[in-house]
């Protein structure tokens, strides 16, 4: 049941299989009187979804405050990490230990350039490439592949009193958000379905979810799911990943994220290339 007190700024759209008409066209064909614009009566919407159960309504969410929102992470598929990637935010470990717990041996660790990352096959090849950077108490590991979000790795990254937040983008069906503390998964969920949370304390991040426009007690399917999950990771860690040129943050970002730690991808960074 949705939290009746929850209100947010958001947009919805319908995801329809080929051949399924839109709601207005269906309504006209089935004797329901609706206008060409304006709101669809609730009874017509209910009838439409009952007749077309394969149609899904998804919600595009927005930050409800001036903090980090999904818009910051609306990256293109052809970005430096490609369509399949994992990003882990880790507190309590140094850079070498993060790479070690992700499976790297001493001889694997070296400096890696942005050009090498961009040219790497990632999840479609036999190896994955990882780069890391430290910002204050947190280390950010960017993996062109899936290693950084595997459950055993996320738990290992948090052992010893630390925290690890991992976000996996993997063509929708295998997207994942995991938050672990001291070796235990506190909460995890598929980013598009944040209502289905698992872990030792699945509701711990509900306050953050509400500020991202997500009702944690509702059943909305999130359209911009991975950007929202990355924004959630940023709110937990205080680290924001932004692609920009030069050494100074653009004024509109500097004003918006005052006090946040900004990761601008620098070349080269410490990293490793590991087998899948």
Predicted regions mapped to residue ranges:
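N-terminal "first-domain core" detector
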Residues: 65-111
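Defense-system signaling and execution modules centered on TIR/cGAS-STING-like, death/scaffold domains
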Residues: 1-2, 52-65
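Extended, low-hydrophobicity segments enriched in charged/polar residues
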Residues: 7-13
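Short, intrinsically disordered low-complexity segments
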Residues: 111-156, 160-191
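Long, compositionally biased intrinsically disordered terminal regions
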Residues: 182-276
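Short, Lys/Arg-enriched alpha-helical microdomains
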Residues: 36-55
């Amino acid at each position: 049941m949705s939290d009746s007190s929850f209100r947010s700024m958001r947009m919805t759209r319908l995801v329809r299989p080929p051949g399924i008409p839109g709601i207005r066209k269906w309504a006209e064909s089935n004797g329901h009187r609706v206008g060409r614009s304006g709101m669809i009566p609730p009874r017509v919407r209910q009838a439409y979804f009952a007749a077309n159960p394969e149609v899904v309504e998804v919600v595009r969410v927005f930050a409800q405050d001036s903090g980090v929102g999904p818009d910051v992470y609306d990256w293109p598929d052809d970005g430096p990490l490609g369509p399949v990637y994992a990003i882990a935010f880790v507190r309590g470990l140094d850079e070498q230990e993060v790479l070690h717990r992700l499976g790297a041996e001493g001889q694997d660790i070296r400096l890696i350039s942005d050009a090498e990352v961009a040219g790497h096959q990632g999840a479609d090849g036999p190896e994955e490439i990882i780069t890391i950077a430290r910002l204050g108490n947190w280390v950010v590991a960017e993996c062109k592949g899936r290693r950084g979000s595997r459950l055993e790795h996320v738990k290992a990254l948090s052992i010893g009193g630390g925290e690890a937040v991992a976000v996996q983008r993997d063509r929708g069906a295998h997207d994942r958000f995991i938050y672990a503390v001291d070796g235990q998964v506190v909460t995890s969920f598929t980013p598009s379905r944040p209502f289905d949370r698992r872990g030792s304390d699945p509701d711990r991040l509900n306050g953050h979810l509400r500020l991202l426009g997500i009702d944690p007690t509702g059943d909305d399917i999130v359209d911009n799911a991975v950007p929202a999950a990355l924004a959630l990771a940023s709110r937990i860690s205080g680290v924001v990943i932004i692609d920009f040129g030069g050494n100074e943050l653009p004024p509109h970002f500097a004003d918006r994220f005052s006090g946040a730690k900004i990761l601008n991808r620098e070349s080269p960074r410490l990293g490793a290339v590991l087998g899948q």
